[in-house]
Amino acid sequence: MTTQSEYDYIIIGAGSAGNTLAARLTEDAGVTVLLLEAGGPDYRLDFRTQMPAALAFPLQGRRYNWAYETEPEPHMDNRRMECGRGKGLGGSSLINGMCYIRGNAMDYDGWAKEPGLEDWSYLDCLPYFRKAETRDIGPNDYHGGEGPVSVTTPKAGNNPLFHAMVEAGVQAGFPRTDDLNGYQQEGFGPMDRTVTPKGRRASTARGYLDEAKKRDTLSIVTHALTDRILFEGKRAVGVAYLVGDSDTRIEVRARKEVLLCGGAIASPQILQRSGVGPAEVLNKLDIPVVHDLPGVGQNLQDHLEMYLQYACTQPVSLYPSLKWWNQPAIGAEWMFLGTGIGASNQFEAGGFIRSSEAFEWPNIQYHFLPVAINYNGTKGVQEHGFQAHVGSMRSPSRGRVHVKSKDPREYPSILFNYMASDQDWQEFRDGIRLTREIMQQPALDPYRGREISPGIDVQSDEALDQFVREHAETAYHPSCSCKMGTDEMAVVDGQGRVHGMQNLRVVDASIMPIITTGNLNAPTIMIAEKIADKIRGRQPLPRSTADYFVAGDKPARGKPLREISHQA
């Protein structure tokens, strides 16, 4: 527990970005940092967060998960949908699926075309991805070998379904790639994961804080719920927070800056509660307006996905591992040897494709899983099976986050506005139909049984749309709600500094202007690494000179090995 009342920097949120900043800022001698986290420690003996294969467990309770819900989503049968966010040291890196996916080079080149974001091109960002990473098979032009984030690659001898699913994607006419984070993201191939060589989850608490905690210049307070940021005029001077169930406000001062790293839900929420945001929202709640900034909480984006599930005709799926009587042996091997089923998140193959020539870079992502079950561990199919998670990457739909009261313990109002555009519906129809073509390729002949979900009778546009409305779920990638840029809806500049304010930055997935093509943990860490150098007054790392794939006029798909006709 801290006793000081003043620090150089106060960081709100010990998630993927906050832990990165805390570690990097305290590398400079004499720089004091207070890291505030509303959740608790990352208990290293709790298999639910430390065992990769147990990734569904933290989503089922509230110890590690804020477990937000959306408002009724108007295009999704008015379902209130899950919006799980990490709570505890590590933030969402403590409960995520551990997929290490950086996004497409064109995502960052697209950001860099926006005024004020010119230094966010892919070749500007790549050195920071490398700085953060230690890849188990060693560094190269795309991968790091000395960073805090431990990345494990799939190995020979893993589940045969991974290999079969990648081969099926290639047989369907799509590219093959040997590294989804390397020269070419587009195509099917092995998927890296944030797991240590000893088979433990490589959260940012493990990667960054374990080293930083040794410095007496870093103070960490857990169970510290931020009430609001304190201002003198337009200058951030400190933070007021509550500890545990107490209503006693503790105030601490920042000599240099307040760094908000709460993520795409909490960061706009804290800004609004502090009086920075759309005046119309704040006035309704009698929150004094410090700065009318209309973009705070707007532009909210996410990835939506569906599961296409198939029975498996050979007993090679992970179905037996779901049975309680098999789990002690799996747990013991993982605990004592760091190997076996427990040591993998089981997302060891995936892919990125263009569903039509209209897209310059991939717009559909696949995760393959050698068992048929919901992401949060519910509704496991009671037989051998496998599934593909399929989702669109850059939906035009935009949502918002608004506070509902001044009370820091009250959850905000969240609306993603999923599937609000015609493009969304076309992408999901195409995604299901292309997946069915992939699943019918010869590589899966030895394994493929009947289609469990959606079911072979779901064929028409109307039937597919209804399936999406009823069954699509979040991929847990909220972002973009405090976007970088210079237009009237931008919240921060290209260094994370809040427009119109002093000594206040937002550094997390909320500042993405447009969501990236893939999972968000790796990009969030990169963003924090890059802005850490700005805060420290350091020269940016030299631009990379690595080559990268641009599709140009290359076709999205070649001729499939086996032609499949769609039923109407």
Curated annotation (Swiss-Prot):
Residues at the catalytic site: 477
Cited PANTHER family: CHOLINE DEHYDROGENASE, MITOCHONDRIAL, GLUCOSE-METHANOL-CHOLINE GMC OXIDOREDUCTASE
Pathway stated in the Swiss-Prot or TrEMBL entry: Amine and polyamine biosynthesis; betaine biosynthesis via choline pathway; betaine aldehyde from choline (cytochrome c reductase route): step 1/1
A single GO molecular function term of this UniProt record: flavin adenine dinucleotide binding
Function: Involved in the biosynthesis of the osmoprotectant glycine betaine. Catalyzes the oxidation of choline to betaine aldehyde and betaine aldehyde to glycine betaine at the same rate.
Top-level taxon: Bacteria
PROSITE patterns recorded: GMC_OXRED_1, GMC_OXRED_2
Lineage summary: Bacteria, Pseudomonadati, Pseudomonadota, Gammaproteobacteria, Pseudomonadales
Gene Ontology cellular component terms for the protein in this record: membrane
Required cofactor(s): FAD
Coiled-coil regions listed: none
Protein's UniProt keywords contain NAD: yes
Keyword DNA damage: no
Matches recorded under InterPro entries: BetA (IPR011533), FAD/NAD-bd_sf (IPR036188), GMC_OxRdtase (IPR012132), GMC_OxRdtase_N (IPR000172), GMC_OxRtase_C (IPR007867)
Gene Ontology biological process: glycine betaine biosynthetic process from choline
E.C. no: 1.1.99.1, 1.2.1.8
Family statement: Belongs to the GMC oxidoreductase family.
Name of this protein: Oxygen-dependent choline dehydrogenase
Residues binding FAD, per UniProt: 8-37
Species whose genome carries this gene: Pseudomonas syringae pv. tomato (strain ATCC BAA-871 / DC3000)
Enzyme class: oxidoreductase
